[in-house]
């Protein structure tokens, strides 16, 4: 595993006398996204936060450390990591009326093993110049032969695409989803590669007309001097607005099985699912809050309202192994 960057956050100088309380966090989410929230949490509660940040390897670390792990809480950047932690039995039940009231049932585990903190949409980006807006587009349309040679995407095995394929299985079954995957593969402009931003760049450069990507990357690219031109070259489309709604992925949190400070971890989750932190957390990363009624960032709000797929995430998660199997069977990435 690569060297882990450790970030220790706390307000020891200004915190109240009970600041000896602590919560230890392993985070897949970048420091700039969580630091303002954790600082405010410490200010409000006196509970210090110690953070270990890494882009990869944290789940393996929690598993390897076992009972000796210092992690009380894991913050994930995608839904797949939440499911991995649960499947490996590295979590404990989140019991909180506050969390249950703040987070709709579709965005928390039915057994209380994880909870979502922010939402993002699996959008289809389209070239403004060559395609225009596609308000009636569906994920199913991506397999239509009329789009042959026009689609770009990252690996089908990436958690973002794996979740989408799992949702297709949940809605359409194995056989129809395999046929759909074969159709999408036939329409690819190039082999799956790169990240979501690379797909938008490819649209800008004329390599493809459509690209799969998470909603928040558009906001991130518009803030980046080098990438702003890529983002300005595409429209953001919310698929399946005429039927079930667009597929949603999430970031989230779990309390670890061997947490030494589970009460403080729960307090942090309760704080992060309440209105103030929801607004901060979602706005910093151009995402959508999981709590209803929380104001969106002005940029995200400018994309307009849309219908979400209401299928619970823990239902979709049941089909992740089969989704991976189908992606391999159709040789999607080859």
Predicted regions and their residues:
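Short beta-strand->loop
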Residues: 26-29, 91-100, 110-111, 114-115, 126-128, 134, 140, 227-247, ...
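Extracellular/periplasmic bilobal clamshell ligand-binding domains
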Residues: 298-334
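Ligand-binding pocket segment of bilobal, Venus flytrap-like solute-binding proteins
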Residues: 167, 172-239
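Mature extracytoplasmic/periplasmic domains
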Residues: 251-310
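Periplasmic solute-binding protein
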Residues: 79-90, 109-137, 165-166, 248-254
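A structural signal for short loop-to-beta-strand junctions that line the ligand-binding cleft
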Residues: 69-74, 92-124, 140, 151-152
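Early extracytoplasmic/lumenal segment of secretory-pathway proteins
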Residues: 20-84
């Amino acid at each position: 595993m690569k060297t882990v960057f450790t970030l220790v956050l706390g307000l020891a100088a200004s915190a109240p006398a009970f600041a000896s309380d602590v919560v230890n966090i392993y985070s897949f989410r970048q420091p700039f996204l969580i630091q303002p929230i954790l600082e405010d949490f410490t200010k409000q509660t006196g509970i210090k936060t110690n953070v270990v940040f890494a882009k990869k390897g944290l789940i393996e670390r929690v598993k390897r450390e076992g009972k000796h792990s210092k992690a009380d809480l894991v913050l994930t950047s995608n839904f797949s990591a939440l499911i991995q932690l649960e499947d490996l039995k590295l979590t404990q039940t989140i019991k909180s009326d506050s969390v249950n009231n703040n987070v709709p049932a579709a965005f928390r585990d039915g057994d209380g093993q994880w909870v979502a903190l922010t939402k993002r949409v699996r959008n289809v980006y389209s070239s403004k110049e060559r395609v225009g807006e596609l308000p009636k587009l569906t994920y199913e349309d991506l397999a239509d032969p009329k789009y042959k040679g026009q689609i770009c995407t990252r690996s089908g095995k990436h958690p973002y695409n794996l979740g989408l394929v799992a949702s297709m299985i949940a809605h359409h079954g194995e056989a129809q989803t395999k046929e759909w995957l074969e159709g999408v593969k036939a329409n690819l402009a190039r082999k799956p590669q790169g990240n979501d931003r690379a797909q938008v760049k490819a649209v800008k450069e004329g390599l493809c007309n459509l690209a799969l990507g998470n909603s928040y990357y558009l906001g991130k690219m518009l803030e980046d001097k080098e990438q702003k031109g890529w983002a300005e070259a595409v429209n953001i489309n919310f698929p399946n607005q005429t039927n079930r709604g667009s597929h949603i992925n999430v970031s989230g949190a779990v309390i670890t099985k061997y947490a030494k400070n589970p009460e403080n971890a729960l307090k942090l989750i309760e704080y992060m699912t309440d209105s103030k932190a929801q607004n901060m957390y979602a706005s910093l990363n151009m995402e959508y809050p999981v709590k209803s009624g929380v104001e969106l960032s002005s940029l995200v709000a400018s994309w307009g309202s849309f219908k979400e797929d209401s299928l619970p995430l823990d239902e979709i998660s049941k089909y992740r192994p089969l989704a991976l199997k189908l992606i391999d069977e159709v040789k999607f990435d080859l």
